[in-house]
Regions:
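Short, surface-exposed amphipathic charged segments that create phosphate/polyanion-binding patches used
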Residues: 49-57, 119-124, 189-192
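A glycosyltransferase accessory/donor-loop signature
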Residues: 2-14, 20, 30-32, 38-45, ...
Length: 232
């Protein structure tokens, strides 16, 4: 029996449009069934799963809730986490198929050193090693047991995002770069074949960034229009 691919999406209330367009793009391009779960912070708080105070340095509501995924999976099997400010253009099953039991986590291993200090809506842009690695993760949940509820709610942001909960970097595997192409950060030429776009600096769903990424912004609006097109 083929089980749906479990996908968890980090959601910020200011990015509802981005979230819904991402969800539509995922299942429109997928060759396999998907089980998509948006991570809604108030829901996690109401269930007693998340209680940490908001960090002034966190730019989104899901900065730390992403690390609850192994717990939500019962520390069994694999799952995908992704930020909501993305757009799928390729078959997410192809990413799912690169799972490797040798690793606890697999991700695109960017060398992203921000040149700016502020990003979308005036949020602080933080610079740290492994920047953006945690924005798209294949999680081997049985090997992520250190991510207990207490740890996720008390560890520092750097401990979480720099994967200090693993024994070492040897437990982090790579996936092809196109599965987390950073719009307006990485070489635009690489975007053409990228199966997953990521507006990490803020996307066209924000008024001040309607054209972020140029033609890629237009592509996002096309995807939005298709997702919400009424049947004639």
């Amino acid at each position: 029996m083929t089980h749906p691919i479990p996908i968890f999406i980090g959601v910020d209330p200011r990015e509802r449009a981005a979230t819904n367009v991402l969800i539509d793009s995922l299942y429109q391009h997928s060759s396999k069934p998907l089980a998509i779960t948006p991570l809604i912070t108030p829901q996690l708080e109401a269930q007693g799963l998340y209680w940490r105070a908001r960090d002034p340095k966190q730019s989104t509501a899901f900065s730390f809730t992403r690390f609850l995924v192994p717990h939500l999976m019962g520390y069994e099997g694999w799952a995908i986490f992704m930020d909501c400010d993305m757009l799928a253009r390729g078959d997410i099953a192809e990413l799912w198929n690169v799972r490797n039991e040798s690793f606890a986590v697999q991700c695109v291993q960017h060398e992203h050193i921000p040149g700016e200090t502020v990003k979308f809506l005036g949020e602080v842009q933080s610079a740290y090693p492994k920047k953006n690695w945690s924005s798209l993760m294949l999680l081997n949940c049985s090997r992520c047991t250190k991510l207990s509820l207490d740890y996720v709610n008390t560890a520092t942001g750097l401990e979480l995002h720099r994967f200090h909960w693993l024994e070492g970097d040897h437990q982090i595997g790579a996936v092809p770069d196109g599965w987390n192409h950073l719009v307006a950060v990485q070489n635009p030429a690489k975007a053409e074949a990228a199966p997953l776009l990521h507006w990490t600096l803020g996307g066209p769903w924000f008024k001040a960034q309607r054209t972020m990424g140029g033609e890629l912004a237009a592509e996002w609006f096309t995807a939005r229009d298709e997702a919400f097109r009424l049947y004639e």
